[in-house]
Amino acid sequence: MAAVQVAASLPCGQPREAPRELSPEQDDGFRRLSARLRALQPDDSTVSRMEIHLLFDQLISENYSEGGGVAPEDVSALLVRACQLVPLNQNHLVSKVCQLIHRLLNRLQVVVDEPNLDFLLTYTISALQQCSSWTHMEILQALAALVYCNGSKCQKHLPDLLGKSGLLMKLSDLSHSDPEVRRAAVHCMANLCLSVPGQPYLEEPYQHVCFQAFLTILQSPKSSDMDDITFCMLLQNALKGIQSLLNGGKMRLTQTEHLGALLAVLKKAMFHGLPGLNIEMPAVLYPTPLPQYDGRSPVKPQQPESTTARSSANKKKKHKVKTKKTQQGEKAEEEEEEPCGEVEAAPGLSMDQANVSGESAWCSSPWGSQGLPVDGGRAAGREQASLPFASSSWKRVSSSESDYSDAEGGMQGKMRSYQAKVRQGALACFLSTIKSIEKKVLYGYWSAFVPDTPELGSPQSVSLMTLTLKDPSPKTRACALQVLSAILEGSKQFLSVAEDTSDHKRAFTPFSVTIASSIRELHRCLLLALVAESSSQTLTQIIKCLANLVSNAPYNRLKLSLLTKVWNHIKPYIRHKDVNVRVSSLTLLGAIVSTHAPLPEVQLLLQQPCSSGLSSSSSATPHLSTPDGWKTFPAGSSLEEASLSSPKGSSEPCWLIRLCISTVVLPKEDSCSGSDAGSALGSTYEPSPMRLEALQVLAHLARGYFSTAQLYLMELGEVICKCMCEANPSIQLHGVKLLEELGAGLIQQYKPDSNIAPEQRVPVHLVVVFWTAMLSGPLPRALQSAEHPTLQASACDALSSILPEAFSSLPNDKQILCITVLLGLNDSKNHLVKAATSRALGVYVLFPCLRQDVIFVADTANAILMSLQDKSLNVRAKAAWSLGNLTDTLIVNMDTPDPSFQDEFSGLLLLKMLQCAIQASTDKDKVKSNAVRALGNLLHFLQPSHVERPRFAEIIEESIQALISTVVNEAAMKVRWNACYAMGNVFKNPALPLGTAPWTSQAYKALTSVVMSCKNFKVRIRSAAALSVPSKRGQYGSLEQFIQIWSALVTALQKSEDTTDFLEFKYCASLRTHICQALLHLLSLASASDLPGIQETLKLHGDMIRSYILQFLKSGAEGDDPGAVHTPQERVQMVRVALKHIHRVQTLAGDTARGAIMGFLEDILTVHCDSSGEQVMLRGPSDQ
């Protein structure tokens, strides 16, 4: 089916609205005229031609303004019939029928079926070929309406339209005499490129033809025969065409030349018609990490006062010639803009001049009473900030072109509106370009669009910030900010290289310093834009852009104060009259407290008193009330939060936490209720988006700054309970998310590696009170809320964040409640709930108070095994993780003095767990990594009573084969690491027939292969560690096998620096440490028959081995690995143990191997002792 073009004034990418019903009179009129048209027969007489003319005129003049309602097939049939009645030699009738096609398809918004589309395209193409040139404009309009979104259905006509001598190619050529026809042809091409989701795209060769045509148009200057407005429309169509190719056509800009040429024309078009700016761009922009045009080093983000003053003076002169009509004329096309938003910031205005307290420079009156606002207007406006805005007197002007007249704006205003649309089109096209290329490619052009120094007016210094600060159209400013946000999104890795430096004596500016300067300049410009903007929509975009910048900038590598400036500037806007501004302000605050948390600078900001940085300003700049006016949270009786409701040692509470709590739970103030479009009628609370954002900020604080949040633990508990009692599922959900973050923060405090002093932790008895209140409140209801599975799943996650030390002290009924609910929800049909439940059970099974409960562990095992069979990969992945945890619990229970757990744990269940783990080891990597971990633990846990049973023999063999295949297969590195670790666990079980079983040689062969050749050094390390686990010589198998393992480790030591991946080098030392440990371990177990083989290896590689063992004795592992022997005494002791063992080995007379190996080890000890100044006994007491 073919979609058709909307009204010509709409952008060609805008989707068609659903047809609306015609009034009965209109419907009757259309049917009556259609019937008359169908009754006519082809006739070349003058009377017949006059009748067709009249009918066409009536059909064209019929009022279709209310939309569709006529059946699409009736419209298609009528248009086909109309074309059949008009021979191509009748130019006037052809022109009239094309007007009819254009009118009906635009106004009635019908879908032309494919056969009729084919006929109508054939007719219009023939008309272009045969009719007089004066008809081409109307024919092209009809053709544009027909091909709209139908490029893929015009395949047979594309050679005629877009071929080398195609009609559209000829008519759009720069050499064509009629500029209007040229523009209409480009419009047709743009419509051809537009595609509908789910339908085929325009074929690739034609995509490139169109792209090159559009690019040529954008690169070409305005011809002398073309007026400014037609030129703007031509540029708009070309930009829309490229945007359609990038969006719907999924065109990829793989060639640097194509991308560079496109970015060059987009940058030029971005500034098209911008007052006071006329830049010349190179034909192609080339990617470069440094500024392309000059090598200026970053300067301080401010200009001399004289520069600013001169700029202001010059602008003021131009300011006077702008008329009120002009401004209204431009405004006419900006339907979505606010009247007071068109103001600019002086490019030289420093951050200090921007007034950190939130007081800002404002335009003294809205457009219409003064001319175009300019730099000087903004700077001078500081003195007039108290003057009221006359926004209430503003009347919006219709956007229809026919409404323009000299009295309402004139041609100059109309032209400015079209120029603004070109800039907006260029920015929209740039946004599509950003989405169609990889970020690493985009960042090569960073310096072309993002400033790194205050702008000086040269072409290389203009950037997206130029538009944000200087463009008179709020919509264009918002578009520029959207593009900048898209560039900043996901830029964390790129920006992470930034580094501030105070070294000004370098001969060149390092890339890291350039990026740091760019980040500073973005902060400066965005804060300038913030204080100078009064359009709420654009203001929202500025704050969102700031939030994106804050989320990605590496503040831990930059000088302090950047976040402080953002923090102080944004504070007033959380009381703005527009709810979207308030929400985005909270989003920005959330970004500040979540970026690289915890940051010392943010920690200090959180401790600021409520009144810090707040001041009153004009009504356009919102402000916080004084501390006396702050909302206060009522004391909760049930939780006794008085002990923690305010910061200890602080005179005032954390203003951000107080703000968020009051936003969530207290009625809104009248001052903020004026434009809360999103709030429910009669609602006493802040709008939902505001409350949700406040809850997210609290969650960020709990995650990154728990030491601050913990002071409000009980009060936040009240907030969570209130949220979960509300009817809005989103509020409930975010309340539960906050609970989960608080629980995670409490757990983090009590981890063994926590650096929080015991006296600074929340006392366990208080955590018990907190969780008892949660479990006595609405949390159980949320857990059973089957109609809201997302809420249910989050409640399960929250339940898994209970501090283990507190769980054991909870009332017995609350413990039973948690366990019963989780085991019950494991049967849920919803995969989100089931995944969360599986994970929660995996957490509970590690709790010290539960892990020795055989019944609970068995029930959990059965629940997890059931989830491992689920269709959802996410459920299976969580279940496999929990199975790994459960098997960790089995291993922990082996070390307890009481053997009752092992005796009581069901052998049948153990068998079932092994079978499920084997099956899971063949699943996706997410499942497999934990399945092999579980297999290793299960095989380690097996008791002699299990191994002796015939039914276990086969499953043990299968389990080990599953591990071996995982070790050697090219799986994800995490999977192979876990498999090697699991193999080491298997080797720890003395009940298994390691050394005699057939699988022994396969297991060692797999591990030695990995330790020698695996690309990932962490996997090699784990393999070497596994090879040093067996504690008896017999477990290594035959003589040949022992020597193979020894030789493989020597080879691995020799290759320990052979890698092409730079990231692996940091693991080299740790790998050598583990290999040296394994070699010394083998020497400490070697038998007399093994020594000759070892001696042969030492003859070949003795010097290399000696140097690495000496290095091992001296420095040890550089990696953080729990299996490494770190202390010097322990490392030396390993050599002594090996030496003592070799000395005790009984060898045959004449065997020189024993003496050679002893001499090798003694030499190592001697050299080590000489270098470290120690004295060491080479022979033990048994040598006497």
Swiss-Prot record:
HEAT repeats lie at residues 159-198, 455-493, 517-555, 561-598. Residues 332-341 have a biased composition (Acidic residues). Residues 313-325 have a biased composition (Basic residues). Keywords: Phosphoprotein, Repeat. It comes from Mus musculus. Gene3D superfamilies: Leucine-rich Repeat Variant. This is HEAT repeat-containing protein 6. Residues 292-345 are annotated as: Disordered. The modification Phosphoserine is found at residues 402, 405, 646. It comes from the Eukaryota. PANTHER family: HEAT REPEAT-CONTAINING PROTEIN 6, MALARIA ANTIGEN-RELATED. The modification Phosphothreonine is found at residue 621. InterPro entries: ARM-like, ARM-type_fold, DUF4042, HEAT6. Residues 303-312 have a biased composition (Polar residues). It holds the Pfam family DUF4042. The lineage of its organism: Eukaryota, Metazoa, Chordata, Craniata, Vertebrata. Transmembrane segments: none annotated.
